[in-house]
């Protein structure tokens, strides 16, 4: 294995997908990893494996804390970094653009400032305080024709609901730059459609969601839940709702808990070809509760 400056090291590896010329993550002696992503962290040492001296470890993604960003398709799969065109020996943090400084802001200190609940709002505040230029988000208007309808039964709890129907979509991974940014702030990349909604939510602080339109019956209604009404969420948790809960429904029942989480009925799947993108303004107190 070339680990930089044309330094070649013998490393014993049993990865099922390993092949010549593949770019991989190597932990050299002294590095700390989690063996197969489980148990206590271990320190890598020079060792003899299968009668061969091994000078490090070729890593799977979950062994170095990257399992959510680079999920393995099968057990025993090595992290394939061939898509990253960097010289051998480049630190993984530099190769994967992970040398960011993360600022953690406790939102309990600004619950009265919904304009600061997204990254752009924080940037705008900093620009105002320090008289700095602020990058502008250019508006975009699409000429979309659709028979899709939305009804809001409680305009006090939902002041605005925008739904855009799109067809002919293909469910693919989001660009790495978007996946990386989402992962850095504690969210798991899923696919381009879901990641886009989460990315926009993080940027603007505004709830967004994507529905599989083929699983929405008739039209969307924003209403209060019925007492004892059931909703199966996309994390497979079933909720028993009460009349204070605000839900997104179709003609058959609740499909999402407004501003919180979507339901299992209409989640985005690899076969999804038609979607409804939701952007809404929900009353904050109810969402927080």
Which residues make up each language-model segment?
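Glycine/proline-enriched, intrinsically flexible loops and inter-domain linkers
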Residues: 130, 134-229
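Short acidic, glycine/serine/threonine-rich loops at helix termini
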Residues: 35-42, 69-72, 116-120, 145-148, ...
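Solvent-exposed alpha-helices and their adjacent loops that cap or buttress functional pockets
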Residues: 16-19, 50-51, 94-98, 127, ...
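Conserved mixed alpha/beta core segments that line enzyme active sites in large multi-domain catalysts
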Residues: 1-12, 197-265
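Conserved catalytic alpha/beta cores of large enzymes that bind or transform nucleotide phosphates
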Residues: 62-63, 71, 80-83, 171-172, ...
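Phosphate-backbone binding interfaces of nucleic-acid-interacting proteins
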Residues: 1-140, 276
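Conserved phosphate/anionic-ligand binding catalytic regions in large, soluble enzymes, centered on
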Residues: 15-23, 111-131, 186-210, 252-272
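Structural motif
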Residues: 9-10, 23-25, 55-57, 102-103, ...
